[in-house]
Amino acid sequence: MSTEVVKEAKLEEEPRQCTKKEKLGHAIGVLGHDSMYTLWSTWTTPFLTDILKLPAGFLAFLFGGARFFDAFTDISMGIIADRTRSKWGRFRPWLLRSGPLMGICLALSFFKPDIGTIGLCIFAGIMYIITGSIVFTSVDIPFWSLPAAMTSNTKERSEIVGFTTTASNTITGIIGLVMPMALAFFGEFDWHVYFFLALAVAVWGVTMYLISFKLVREHVCLLYTSPSPRDC
């Protein structure tokens, strides 16, 4: 079996150093990325227990199974993203592909169909796995891999990550502050409130993903000489 030789190459004829607009674009992306994930990861459990009233045993099985499944999806998505070849680069296309899907899944995760307890268990279980283990993973790994493809300059990469982390902490704090207040005001035991709040965050999140996709550029990519993929 031939050994893969990884070589660094330019995606464009421009210098590898990214612009301020591109750095800003990545930070804008995390405003949508982490607002959706914070809402989902923090409020899914209260929704499943207090609103859908699913059995505790089922939830324990679901959460444990999801953690086990995550181990496979994380590795698989890393390989898929790294081997992606498109006119937009390796990681940037996933903002466009999986970003809108994350918004749809977020809203559906807080939807309550009238299908009985067993039906709700099936629906909630499917949405939990799809949202957290598949769709989120398919955008999270490429998103945080982008800085390495935006520039080959180590200092610039650190600046991008630092700027984006600051934006991440800010939006996480805002969601953590606003969500309890909104639930208390509109009705914390009404599933419609959860759904429409999630829908609002989903629209915001997808918009931020699309803006980020528009602003960010990949200037560095990995070319695999064996096997021979389509050129970046």
Place the predicted regions along the sequence by residue.
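Hydrophobic core of transmembrane alpha-helices in multi-pass small-molecule transporters
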Residues: 118-139
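Helix-loop boundary and gating motifs at the non-cytosolic
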Residues: 14-66
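Glycine-rich segments within core transmembrane alpha-helices of 12-TM secondary carriers
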Residues: 162-177
